[in-house]
């Protein structure tokens, strides 16, 4: 219908939608990732779990709004999580379960724009998944992020491209599922060696906020050039600055968030021209701003360095 689209097909989006698909691809292409096993039966998964060292890493195969992963040393918690996945309580459908090796190291996210001819690096970030301060509590869709990641060097980026991204793009082409769009690689770095944790086939939330404020209007050039398979002619400049975003979430998130709360009287924002507020779970009712539960806003600041950006966002 003559509509320009920059994004993967449904088949290519399996890179995010099915962890078992991506893990099996890694095995086939020798892409560095954690060792793993895939289970279709609850008893088999729990039996295997008891043979593994802690902490356990358990994942629902399908999409789960950022809540389909458990990292825990508690066998009872791990058992309950497995049971919930097979019962269809976690994720969109009754899912297979992946139990994988816990990878030591520091995590980061690296982002690429990809068309049928070209792979372009467009930025990096680090995010915080746990609900509470000091990286504690259950996993969420993301409670904050900053960009760029100080872990990423030119040498490490080269390794990520050659050992992870290029083999992935090759595999998708070989299997008739050629990828185009934004590819977000969630990685762990240990002794200078990157390993793949997972893929998203989009920017991610809240990573999108910090990347887009730093890319500025270039984001539109990326979209249009990518949709027309012209990324090779595009020069992308990563700004020499930093951005940070902090999520404001409803009490009880992610397990039992309240909803329909009126926000007008409780939001006291100290204005700063560097601050951008992105709405998530909000709506207007009778001229009052209300929430739908879960993540409500992200407060995002771009500044000359991360320390300044962090100061401004928390003062706001």
Task: Describe the residue ranges of each PLM region.
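A short, GP-enriched loop/loop-strand-helix hinge that lies immediately N-terminal to
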Residues: 1-17, 30-40
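General beta-strand structural signal in soluble alpha/beta enzymes
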Residues: 5-8, 35-38, 56-60, 71, ...
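Short, charged, surface-exposed secondary-structure boundary motifs
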Residues: 14-20, 132-134
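Short amphipathic alpha-helical segments
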Residues: 66-68, 244, 293-299
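Internal nucleotide-binding/catalytic subdomain
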Residues: 68-211
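Active-site "cap" helix and flanking loop/linker of ATP-utilizing ligase/carboxylase catalytic domains
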Residues: 160-183, 200-274, 280-285
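Generic C-terminus detector
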Residues: 285, 291-316
């Amino acid at each position: 219908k003559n509509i320009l689209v920059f994004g993967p097909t449904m088949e290519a989006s399996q890179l995010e939608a099915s962890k078992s698909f991506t893990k099996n691809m890694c095995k086939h292409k020798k892409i560095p990732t954690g060792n793993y096993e895939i289970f279709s039966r609850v008893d088999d998964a729990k039996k295997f779990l008891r043979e593994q060292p802690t902490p356990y890493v358990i994942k629902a195969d399908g999409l789960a709004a950022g809540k389909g992963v458990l990292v825990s040393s508690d066998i009872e918690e791990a058992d309950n999580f497995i049971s919930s996945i097979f019962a269809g309580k976690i994720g969109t459908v009754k899912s297979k379960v992946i139990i994988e090796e816990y990878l030591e190291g520091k995590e980061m996210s690296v982002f690429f724009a990809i068309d049928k001819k070209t792979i372009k690096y467009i930025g990096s970030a680090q995010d915080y998944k746990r609900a509470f301060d000091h990286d504690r509590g259950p996993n969420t869709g993301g409670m904050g992020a900053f960009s760029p990641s100080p872990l990423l060097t030119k040498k490490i980026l080269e390794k990520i491209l050659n050992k992870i991204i290029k083999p992935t793009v090759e595999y998708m082409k070989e299997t008739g599922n050629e990828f185009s769009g934004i590819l977000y690689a969630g990685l762990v770095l240990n002794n200078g060696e990157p390993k793949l944790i997972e893929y998203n086939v989009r920017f991610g939330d809240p990573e999108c906020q910090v990347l887009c404020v730093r890319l500025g209007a270039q984001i539109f050039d990326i979209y249009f050039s990518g949709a027309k398979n012209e990324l090779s002619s595009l020069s992308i400049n990563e700004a020499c600055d930093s951005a940070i975003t902090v999520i404001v979430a409803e009490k009880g998130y992610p397990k039992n968030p309240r909803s329909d709360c009126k926000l007008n009287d409780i939001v006291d924002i100290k204005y700063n021209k560097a601050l951008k507020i992105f709405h998530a779970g909000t709506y207007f009712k009778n001229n009052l701003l209300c929430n739908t539960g879960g993540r409500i806003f992200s407060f995002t600041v771009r500044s000359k360095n991360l320390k300044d950006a962090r100061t401004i966002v928390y003062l706001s």
